């Protein structure tokens, strides 16, 4: 069946996280600085220890449930364990999340191929974006910063709907928004366990953009593997 819709992952597909995980320590320090400025008097070492305990527990739960609680919950739970009574909607928590997000964004660059590829596909196919991120506001800011938002007919960020890839629901929601069948859609992403297994299980085609050494132990194989976004264009001509 002819492909009518092309959907993309965001991070390490359309935009690149520079330096792997190099962003995390400075982003967390920026978050902690904000908290200190707002009467949260906890040494960074203590905050760091409890934060990772909370984060790892939430990650473990998310791997099972495929839910994506907002990053705010991570911070509020950390502070509750440290003796502070903040809920996830408190302005201090939201400000701390924003501080983390702003530092993280300094480590993000646009894949130089992304604008031209999206420009070529826009109008010819329905376009969608599905991203796993617990700070959806950050994803929207990046899409604005790099002038990508207007290319897409649907944009789904996991932290907004409390579902994350590879859950069937997040892909099905995107397909419904685009008005296409799974067999008429193709997904492009860099993480085999999320961006290949997820769409393939609901009946979509999936293309892996290889940003790291090949994993030959993938349980579910991509339909194609590419190393640059521009390689997607001739593949679509044959679909």
Name each region found by the language model.
Residues 1-6, 16-18, 22, 41-45, ...:
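Asp-based, Mg2+/Mn2+-dependent phosphohydrolase catalytic module
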Residues 123-124:
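Structured helix-beta-strand junction loops
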């Amino acid at each position: 069946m002819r492909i009518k819709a092309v959907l993309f992952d965001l991070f390490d597909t359309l935009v690149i996280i520079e330096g792997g995980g190099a962003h995390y320590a400075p982003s967390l320090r920026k978050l902690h600085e904000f908290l200190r400025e707002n009467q949260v008097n906890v040494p960074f070492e203590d905050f760091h220890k409890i934060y990772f305990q909370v984060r790892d527990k939430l990650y473990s739960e998310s791997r099972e449930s495929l839910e994506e609680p907002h990053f705010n919950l991570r911070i509020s739970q950390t502070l509750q364990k440290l003796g502070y009574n903040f809920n996830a909607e408190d302005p201090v928590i939201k400000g701390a999340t924003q501080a983390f997000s702003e530092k993280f964004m300094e480590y993000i660059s646009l894949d130089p191929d992304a604008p031209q590829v999206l420009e070529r596909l826009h109008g010819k196919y329905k376009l969608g974006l599905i991203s796993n991120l617990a700070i959806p506001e950050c994803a929207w800011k990046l899409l604005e910063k790099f002038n990508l938002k207007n290319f897409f007919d649907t944009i789904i960020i996991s932290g907004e709907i409390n579902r994350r890839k590879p859950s069937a629901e997040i892909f099905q929601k995107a397909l419904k928004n685009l008005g296409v069948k799974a067999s008429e859609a193709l997904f492009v992403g860099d993480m085999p366990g999320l961006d290949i297994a997820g769409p393939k299980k609901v009946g979509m085609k999936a293309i892996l953009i290889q940003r790291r050494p090949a994993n030959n132990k993938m349980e579910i194989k991509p339909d194609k593997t590419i190393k640059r976004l521009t390689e997607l264009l001739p593949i679509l001509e044959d679909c």
